[in-house]
Amino acid sequence: MKQTLALIVLSIVSTGLFSCRHSRQIAGTSFPVTDTTQHNIISKTDSASVAASNAYNKELLSKLRSNYISFNTFSAKLKIDFETESKQMSGINANMRMQKDSFIWISVSAPIIGEVARAIITPDSLKAIDKFHKIAYLRDLRYAQDVLNIPFDFKTLQDLIIGNPVYLTDSVYQVVKTPAVISFTCDSTIFTSLFNVFADDYILQQSKVMDKDSTRGRSVELTYGEYKSLDKIKFATRRRVFVEEKSYTKINMDFNKIDFDQPVSFPFTIPSGYSRE
């Protein structure tokens, strides 16, 4: 239960209602585009091409970052399907609320049963209650990292929720352009990150984060679809998460009832009689 709860919490925090961006269903694309014979590959062969490549990469990052979602508060409801090699759960309901740089609040409900778990995350702590087994978990945020074997911080969780790119750095290389999608790679200290963005407006289609230590064989792939707009914010209402390390975890998330910058509360109490771990 501990790992399942942690995975659900991360999956929810992993990943506008008026004008729907049509036809951008969730669809996978290889990293980078594998058939390069008909596409423009930006290479570095001489000083002129190096300068042009650097200028393009800078513009690419600027346009991608111009789509970053800025907010003070956020709330949403979502449905989750969750699958591992040993278990599968469908139709999980969740409520999520967030105050930037301060709180992430999640309530998870199962069909018929009702609320089964609630969690609140701060920049340095994770508190969760398992209502089914009447257990409270009080942990440093590092605990979630240890359980999931994925290094992240509070800001990374915020970006996962909102749909901003994670582990994006300025070290862009291996850029491949097609009429529909631009693919590129960048490096951080621990990870190599691969990105696909739509060529017309530079919003995320897909990203994949891989551990540089190949012996671990671990990666997280995020796919974004069904973009909707609310007050100029482009929000991916459908997310697919695929986590792989020895075994796999698949999560599908459908967001609805999304609100930005509205008053939110974060109720969290540990009922009497709950054991603490």
Please tell me what each predicted stretch does.
Residues 16-19:
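C-terminal motif of bacterial Sec signal peptides marking the signal peptidase cleavage site
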Residues 22-26, 174-277:
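Gly/Pro-enriched, hydrophobic low-complexity segments
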Residues 66-74, 85-90, 97-102, 200, ...:
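Edge/loop elements at the starts and ends of beta-strands within beta-rich repeat scaffolds
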Residues 103-155:
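An acidic-aromatic
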